Amino acid sequence: MHITEIAKVVEQVRKTNPLVHNITNVVVTNFTANGLLALGASPVMAYAKEEVAEMASIAGALVLNMGTLRPDEVEAMLIAGKAANQQHVPVLFDPVGAGATLYRTEVARHIPNEIKLAMIRGNAAEIANVIHEKWEIKGVDAGTGNGDSVAIATKAANKLGTVAVITGKEDIVTDGKRTVIIRNGHPILTKVTGTGCLLTSVMGAFVAVEQDYVKAAVAALTFYGVAAEIAASKTVDQGPGSFQVEFLNQLANVTVSDIEQYGKAEEVR
């Protein structure tokens, strides 16, 4: 998968301005909307069960994020996801904190059983817990533990019949056959709440314009990581507040040539 080919997906997102329907959490809603707008996508946050089916049906992609979990939101996710499936709208799922509590884990396992997913994205612990693999987790952001992340991602892709993405120091994308590792990004991303949730929504924008979901995921991760690296370089010693603002700027400003120059994506099988 050549880096130039990956970079061109960014141009397609900006040219197409895809509508991304987000059922996400209250902590990250504003940041997610601003990030998608900066990228060039069109965000909508619609949660009411009375309208989610209609909204999901006209979207380019549907993103389900269970960060601040409530029963009414779970119901809305299921309604929206099934409507999206009927209209062949790709559905992305971010199982935030799967493994942290029994209820959260039950929901994280139930949604993929009810909805056909185009993609699932989380840290290693979250993805492992979704597919009943042992991996310790502490809180909703814990991704460290003992295990083989590539093996977990591959098992998830095969078991769920989807593209599985595990993010961390290195990002892994696999459909069970093709596996790509992306080595872009910056540690300061972990100091700004919502950067993982925004990433899943950004991936939704890429999936909306690229039917090869492995390529879409790799393109989104590479783009996102390069934007973070450039933003970090421009805000050295200024802290996470300045980084957050500059990161939004870079989501708007990163070019194809930036991705070609700094992108680090390697297909390992």
From Swiss-Prot:
Classification via NCBIfam families: PRK09355.1, thiM
Native species: Bacillus cytotoxicus (strain DSM 22905 / CIP 110041 / 391-98 / NVH 391-98)
Alphabetized CDD domains for the sequence: THZ_kinase
Binding site for substrate: M45, G194
Catalysis performed (reactions): 5-(2-hydroxyethyl)-4-methylthiazole + ATP = 4-methyl-5-(2-phosphooxyethyl)-thiazole + ADP + H(+)
EC number assigned by the record: 2.7.1.50
Leading EC class: transferase
Cofactors (names): Mg(2+)
Protein name: Hydroxyethylthiazole kinase
Family assignment from sequence similarity: Belongs to the Thz kinase family.
Keywords: ATP-binding, Kinase, Magnesium, Metal-binding, Nucleotide-binding, Thiamine biosynthesis, Transferase
InterPro entries from the UniProt entry: Hyethyz_kinase, Ribokinase-like
Pathway membership, UniProt: Cofactor biosynthesis; thiamine diphosphate biosynthesis; 4-methyl-5-(2-phosphoethyl)-thiazole from 5-(2-hydroxyethyl)-4-methylthiazole: step 1/1
Signal sequence extent: none
Taxonomic lineage: Bacteria, Bacillati, Bacillota, Bacilli, Bacillales
Function: Catalyzes the phosphorylation of the hydroxyl group of 4-methyl-5-beta-hydroxyethylthiazole (THZ).
List of residues binding ATP: R121, T167
